Amino acid sequence: MKNALKKIVTPILAALLLSGCASEETPPKKSDASASASAAQSSGSEDNPPIQKDSFYPTFDDNEDYASMKDKLAKQIDCILNSDTPPFSMYLNNKAEDISKWKKTVTKTEKDGNIYISAIYTDPSDSLLATLSATLFQDSPTVDFTVHLKNTSDKNSPIISKLYGMDILVSLPKQGNHFTLNTTQGCGVQGSEDYDDFGLETYKLLPSTWRTFEPKQGRSSDEAWPFFDILGDHCGLLVAVGWSGQWKARFSEKNESVAIQSGMANLNTYLEPGEEIRTPSYSITYFEGDAEYGHNIFRRLILKHYTPNTETKYVCKLPLSMSALADRTETVFKSNIAAAAKYGVPVDNLVIDAGWYTDVKPEANGIVSGSIPWEKWYYQAGNWSFNTSLFPNGNLKSLSLMAQKNGIGVALWLEPERAHSGTHMIDNHSELYFSEEAGGVHLLNLGKEEAREWLIDYISNLIEENNLSIYRQDFNMTPEWFWDNEYPFDRLGIAEIRYIEGLYYVFDTIREKYPAVLIDSCASGGRRMDIEILKRTVILWRTDYCCNTYGKNFFDEGTQFQMQSLSYWLPLHATGVGTDKFESYNFRSALAAGINFNSYISEENAEDAKFLVSQASKMRPYYYGDYYQILEPVYDFKSWQAYEVWRNDLGKGALVVYIRENAKETV
């Protein structure tokens, strides 16, 4: 990192301190804000032109660097598989099952450099069959695995509980006299929309003491984070849980090693004859070096194996999006597109967010007075047809074609998993939902084939009829109660498993049918992020923090904190600017691999809009590279903040520095 940083930091800081802006272009007009921001690039001269579009697809020449780490990880895996203690565990009829007595068969195959492992365990009575399927990646010191459990008998199985798909001891040298575990708070810990989403949490692992984590009420990153690092002496692990529901993970020190257990939080069920269930998936990355190095290996892993490919077979490109609630008519949206094209603002995408299905009426100017009220867009979920007062044709086809001619895609918001009593879906298709409701809220039962097929057909029609480039699926409810109350206690967990499997099936089917269409996963912001979701979707709205009132309970410094904290783990995510202005400090606070901003571009703000969006476009590819926290993320109004994004394959990067309102002149 230091070698890379030396290439750009000295000239950039010199320019920053002299001019307040290190870009080669003319900066936008000065704002009244006393705070300033700088974003600088190490490219753009005549001899060194700006990076081109294909630079969104990084090439990683890192296999040699990983050889020793991959070898050590493979030996750990062999040690675990060859031991009497299996790498998973369960209780049967409330007693710990001794799986070491089960018959075990392990096979390995190699394809494209990856090593595929199948470990099959059969209980002595030949009634339960457990299959551990693992992949040891050729291009990363990482193993990915899942356990499936099947009842192969002709009668119900014993009650299965405490099924940990990962129950392992990993040998690491200690960091001093202990291991250190890091994770984050997840999304929404302090409230529905809070500045410290994804703030780092650090713990010591102690013998005989379990440190336990699980999310809130069924969304995988709601007040918890299914990603962890465990640090030893100049080495460590990155552990990820792949379950978009109610997972559980716990960590401890045991016999000078790290003990890890993880599975579903709520499981107490028998299996019917022939019935099969699965555990969460898991990813373990081993690294040698400091935590920053390990996290950059993990970011590269996410790009290589846990990011959806577009039809070009490359890692996806997050858009620069004009974004708005559906609080205006199609004519006004068309004028927004026309203005962006007229003034040369390099917009990729127009996001039409919630409200297009409500019964609101626009004023004579085509705008809904006061925008879409919360009680409209929220409680009318389930009326999934276009408001013809806003969209006279009952679709977006004309709007999408006009946008496409100007090189702009269209994204549309939908929240199909939730519906309210009194809406079309509940009045006409209540059989597709869970049998219980909560305060008029209903949850689509994706464990039912007919519900899955309805949703696939509806999304498919939405994409085709409206020529969508991005489909945004939101999820503004907590599903755990619905899952846990669908069946008797001796079938606890089955509804959740079938629901999560159904969710993945829907996303996989849509991805297969429309490989050029991105699925944007939103869940009250970023409350459903895990490796299974990341494999299938992108995160274009990482938090609802910027839905708050600017200057009251939303500040640019919070956006900066979230960007720096989340980027330590994941490379691809985006957020909203949060205001209707194009002001440099505010806009640059939201810089990331993608960005959402005001759709009202006019002669008055066109110069600033073009400058800032163009700068975001030029910087965007660097976020696909390695990430370095130059200064530790802090939420305040007096510090400097700085981070670097660096593309080793290009030998180029960017340094972003924020000088906050009450900051001292030097740092």
PLM feature spans:
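Bacterial N-terminal signal peptides that target proteins for export
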Residues: 1-9
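C-terminal motif of bacterial Sec signal peptides marking the signal peptidase cleavage site
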Residues: 18-20
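N-terminal, intrinsically disordered, polar/charged segments of Gram-positive cell-envelope systems
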Residues: 26-48
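Polysaccharide-binding surfaces and accessory modules of carbohydrate-active proteins
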Residues: 44-251, 265, 667
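Active-site-proximal substrate-binding groove within the catalytic cores of carbohydrate-active enzymes
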Residues: 65-67, 80, 84, 92, ...
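Conserved, mostly hydrophobic/aromatic
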Residues: 147, 274, 350, 403, ...
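Short Pro-Gly-centered flexible turn/kink motifs
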Residues: 269-288, 655
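Aromatic-lined carbohydrate-binding/catalytic grooves of carbohydrate-active enzymes
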Residues: 315-460, 470, 480-482
